[in-house]
Every structure is written in C-alpha cells, then in structure tokens.
Amino acid sequence: MQILDKINKENISDAFALSMTKFFRFTADTFFAKRYGHRAVVLETVAGVPGMVAGVWMHFKSLRAMKAGYGEQIREMLAEAENERMHLMFFIEIAKPNIFERLLVTSAQIVFGLFYLFMYVFFTRTAHRMIGYFEDEAVKSYTEYLELVESGKVTNIDAPDLCLLYTSPSPRDP
C-alpha cells in the first residue's frame, strides 16, 4: 500500500503537501514526458535537498541550544543527502543531460532548496508530509521506468562504473 492511500488528507497541512507534490509531479511529467533518465536527474537533484536542509537546521539548532546530542541525527540527515547526491551522479552518467537540462537542475536546486527551507523552518510537519508524498511519487515513477526496461521498451544498459564502485562491499568516495 502506498503512503498516499494511508494518510488522512482532511487537514490543510496534508492537503497543501499533496497539492505541492501533484504540482511538482505534473511539471516533471509535462517537461520530461517519457524521458525517465532525464526526469530521474531532476528528481534526484530535488531528493538531496531535504536531508541537507534538515541536517544543517539540526546543526544550527544544536549551536543555538549550546547542547550536544544532535550529532547522530545530523550525520543521518547529511548521509541521506549524500546518498541522493550519488543517485544523481548515477543518473547523470545514464541520461547525459545537455547544458539546458544542467541549468534546469541548478534552477531546481535553488528554487526547491529555498522553498523547502522555508517549509522546514516554519511548517515542519507539512515539509515532512510533502517528502513522504514525494517518496511515494518516486516509487511510482521508478516502477514505471523499471516496467518499461523489463518490457524492452527502454534499453537496459549496464550500470555505470561509478554505480558499481559506490555499491561495492567496500565503497570508496567517488
């Protein structure tokens, strides 16, 4: 069962989070259509933002409170952002985005980064809910992509060397 099916969408926070998710999904679907590799580049660009925002915000919270104790949470959030960065690197090798798409990635990072920072600082619950919806949409999008690969409609290429290096039993920092 998907996240969207489990959540009460009656309150304004959930409704806003869901509407933003649908807006971003519509925008990605319209712009990229069935170019799943290129869509994944932008999705992974955006996916790295929440972990970085949360990690940095917790870091500042620790500094403001002048207390230790946030270290593990900070490391987990930043590790999640790093993991998403690596996913982006894999899809860049697969999709080979052109200069326009690279500019789009930069724009998406700036716009979504500022938007998510605002949401996280002032409406934390809604920000978390929105990311839950994003993850659900990512599962749908990647499932569609996988089905196309398995059906032969999209070429199944070898994993990039960077991917193999990163996922090896003793990964090195690429």
Residue ranges and their predicted role:
Residues 1-69, 152-164:
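Terminal targeting/low-complexity segments that flank the catalytic cores of oxidoreductases
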Residues 44, 48-62, 66, 83-87, ...:
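Residue-level signal for functionally critical sites in structured catalytic/ligand-binding pockets
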Residues 75-150, 158-161:
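Active-site-proximal alpha-helical scaffolds that flank and shape metal-associated catalytic sites
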Residues 166-174:
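Single conserved hydrophobic/aromatic residue that forms the stacking wall/gate
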